[in-house]
């Protein structure tokens, strides 16, 4: 499951605002509505593998489950109406205010506690984070983003120990970041079924594992394939056969450069 946690800093927690002025009296709830759309909508459908968590003023949590939500439409006004109902209905315990939308009083720390309980992996989106192309996404990622404002000092303190990634030096809208993250995750899922290509050949599994460990440090997954020339087959029994390091096609150039910088010139066929 993918999750996107968006912190809204100005939306009235009471839900008392007019749908005719989303950027104004609604505290830029239009930013949250666009984030919901980017996270959940695909052409003619909903991403059922995605959950959106909106945290309003560190006080109210709204969860929207892609596999359960109903009556969600692409326009911001109708999405704002759903969020308004959630804000008005939020209580100490979780309440389903519309199908697939659950609201409750909660703080950022409580949101993180829930993520850990369901074995999600929180990751902060930040302009000064590590480059995303050097990051290996874990299973069940939960990306934490801010709205049109920077994280507050209190937010930063709560998120201080979490990994941070950046999508580049240019500041992007929250919804744009979500679209890019979906693309990267979709691409990675496609790569799981793609053919791996030969990156390097070494003699002996211990050395191969040193190299694959280095590649993993750079966010490049790899597989090992043992290969023995028939006349040398007994050597495989002692772990001394030829071992091939296989990577995804899109990682090949960078992986070979890393091996060349830290070990030796890569050997291919």
Task: Kindly give the residue locations of the regions a language model identified.
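Acidic/polar low-complexity segments and flexible, solvent-exposed patches
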Residues: 191-269
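RNA substrate-binding interface of SAM-dependent RNA methyltransferases
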Residues: 1-126
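Structured adenosyl-cofactor binding patch, chiefly the S-adenosyl-L-methionine
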Residues: 153-191
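Hydrophobic anchor at the start of a short beta-strand
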Residues: 122, 164, 222
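Short, glycine/polar-rich helix-capping loops at beta-to-alpha or helix-loop-helix junctions
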Residues: 150-158, 228-233
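Anion (oxyanion) recognition and catalysis
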Residues: 116, 160, 216
